[in-house]
From Swiss-Prot:
Biological classification of the source: Archaea, Methanobacteriati, Methanobacteriota, Methanomada group, Methanobacteria
Functional pathway: Pyrimidine metabolism; dTTP biosynthesis
Organism of derivation: Methanothermobacter marburgensis (strain ATCC BAA-927 / DSM 2133 / JCM 14651 / NBRC 100331 / OCM 82 / Marburg) (Methanobacterium thermoautotrophicum)
HAMAP family for the chain: Thymidy_synth_arch (MF_01686)
Name this polypeptide is given: Putative thymidylate synthase
Family annotation (Gene3D superfamilies): Thymidylate synthase/dCMP hydroxymethylase domain (3.30.572.10)
CC per GO annotation: cytosol
Name of the gene this protein is made from: thyA
Record-annotated active site: 146
PANTHER family membership: THYMIDYLATE SYNTHASE 1
Main localization of the protein described in the UniProt heading: cytoplasm
The family this protein is said to belong to: Belongs to the thymidylate synthase family. Archaeal-type ThyA subfamily.
């Protein structure tokens, strides 16, 4: 059974996932031997991914100031903004992979631009889908993308974004991933000429690492 929730903003979704995993997660060890608590197939729909505004709007250029960051969380400010920009940049920046590189350059095609073109040509298109998984490399590598797919749909003048993660570090990565996805969605929506709608994130393995158990409990206590 999938665990499905709908929230107003990104920070709220993150907190609910942390609570769910710490209360109901099963303990398993991953390929590296790390102990985690895991809930399978969490689906979070974020109604206002760009922040509480009462309406849908585009972010000011290169600014994420309207997105609330959980108090005391280590992803914030310039660090969070630079990470979010990687969703749009084709530069790997010395890493084995980045989402932006996989989406914009790795396969020899800019999937973001192609998705924008499809949506400009047909607002109702069901083909504005992008992938990061490269079977030739990722079936043999230990360092593989966690986010596998991003899909865009325009309905009633809004861009609805859906993303799939095969594996998702909820405490350490879900929040910045969601913000980066919002950054990407805002770019696509602006280019297509529509507003930013809901973002839905499906995490097949939603987990928290043992190293973050204590912090996660504190977040829940203070939440």
């Amino acid at each position: 059974m999938a665990y499905e929730i709908s929230v107003d903003e990104i920070a709220e979704g993150w907190l609910k996932l942390v609570e769910k995993i710490m209360s109901d997660g099963r303990e398993i060890r991953d390929e590296r031997g790390s102990l985690t608590r895991e809930v399978m197939n969490t689906v979070v729909t974020i109604k206002n991914p760009l922040g509480r505004s009462g309406d849908f709007y585009h972010l000011p250029a290169r600014s994420l100031i309207n997105i609330r960051v959980p108090e005391g969380y280590f992803w914030s400010g310039e660090k969070l903004e630079k990470y979010s920009e990687q969703f749009l940049s084709d530069d790997r920046k010395g890493f084995v992979y980045t989402y932006g590189n996989r989406l914009r350059a790795h396969f020899g095609v800019d999937q973001v631009d192609r998705a924008i073109e499809r949506l400009k040509n047909c607002k109702e298109s069901r083909r504005a889908t992008m992938v990061t998984w490269d079977p030739k490399i990722d079936t043999e590598s230990d360092e593989v993308p966690c986010m596998i797919l991003v899909d865009f749909k325009v309905r009633e003048g809004r861009l609805f974004t859906t993303a799939l993660w095969r594996s998702h570090d909820i405490y350490g990565a879900w929040f910045p991933n969601a913000v980066g996805l919002a950054y990407l969605a805002d770019h696509v929506a602006s280019e297509v000429g529509v507003e930013v709608g809901h973002i839905t994130i499906h995490s097949i393995s939603a987990h928290i690492y043992e190293v973050n158990f204590k912090e996660a409990k504190e977040v829940i206590k203070n939440g």
